[in-house]
């Protein structure tokens, strides 16, 4: 059985507030965010992580997920990856200047 989750978010709606960052990003992701120079880049990064985690949450509706405990990384090809329990999860992420869309497929 496959479960699918999709999320889209407007980048400009992201607010770079400490409380929001602490709640939605893992420690590693928060460090990556701090290393980014531009506010636009930071908002895009936060929006991408938020959208990916929301898509995962929607695909796994019966799992108790804490967003700050989910760490999204990139594989050698630059694709987002995540490890949650024994699930096989495929992630896809795309964006333009205004929106980020994320898809999570659970196998």
Name what the model sees in each region.
Residues 1-107:
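Core catalytic alpha/beta fold that binds nucleotide/phospho-ligands
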């Amino acid at each position: 059985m496959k479960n699918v989750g999709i999320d889209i978010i407007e980048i400009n709606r992201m607010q770079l507030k400490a409380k929001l960052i602490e709640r939605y990003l893992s420690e590693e992701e928060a460090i990556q965010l701090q290393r980014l120079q531009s506010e636009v880049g930071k908002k895009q990064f936060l929006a991408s992580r938020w959208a990916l985690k929301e898509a995962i949450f929607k695909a796994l509706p019966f799992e108790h997920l804490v967003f700050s405990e989910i760490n999204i990384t990139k594989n050698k090809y630059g694709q987002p990856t995540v490890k949650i329990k024994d699930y096989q999860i495929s992630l896809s992420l795309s964006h333009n200047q205004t929106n980020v869309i994320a898809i999570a497929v659970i196998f």
